[in-house]
Amino acid sequence: MFKEAEELPHAISHFSQIMEIIGDKKPLLILDYDGTLSPIVSDPNKAVLSKEMKEALIQLAEIIPVAVISGRDRADVEQKVALDQLIYAGSHGLDMVGPEGLEIPQKVSDYILDSLKEAAENLQRELKEVKGCIVESKKFAIAVHFRNVAEEEVERVKDAVIKELHRHQNLKKGTGKMILELKPAIDWHKGRAVNWLFEALNMNKDSGIPLFIGDDITDEDAFASITKEGIGILVGTHGEKTAATYSLKDTDDVGRFLEKFFQTMKGHGKL
């Protein structure tokens, strides 16, 4: 059931309820990066992980599997977090690696990669004069950032993206917070990535439970995929109804939740 973000119970205020759901199961903790682990900033290159958040991830990774799944390139988010113990997934889960040789099989054809390259070149040429617009060419996607674009120019940005989507039928549109994406038109998203990871780690619903924390509309696929057998926590709001079951206010709230979660897990589930 989808709800407004304001209707969700606060994850820290209802922490004991979350721990009851987890029970004796081993959690798989999965987090988005931008807007969840690091505040959203006008320049995506300046989204930095705080020392406190990094310490929380280090502590948790010692006792449970921890993954970061981002729309960024995997190498980018891996460099920003810079912790060897974690599992990293870029391009909404298309590119994933982790400890002990964990790696997701390649799912994107050379044909699609060629289309992404051509579309990126076209968009960079078309939008180079739009002040504040950033065309970010990634390994498996193109992100067009318009957060800093003047309101009267936003439509021009959107039209350019639509034009490329019409030109390249093997690409599809993705949306986020002040971002438009062109990505492979294949049946893959964060929800499928979470399910794949859960199985790849030899976890099952009887002994394990996924806990996903994210802030963006792209995280809804993950929330929806674990609604019955996991816990979804929405950070802030993305303006649409959500399949998440709990909420946190912001990245600071995420940090407080992770610290409380670690202390509880370390104490073998005793509150």
Region spans (language model):
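Short, basic, glycine/proline-bearing loop/turn elements
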Residues: 2-4, 36-44, 209
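Short amphipathic alpha-helices and their capping/turn segments at secondary-structure boundaries
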Residues: 10-25, 75-81
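A general structural motif
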Residues: 24-26, 63, 85, 139, ...
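Active-site phosphate-binding/coordination module
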Residues: 47-138
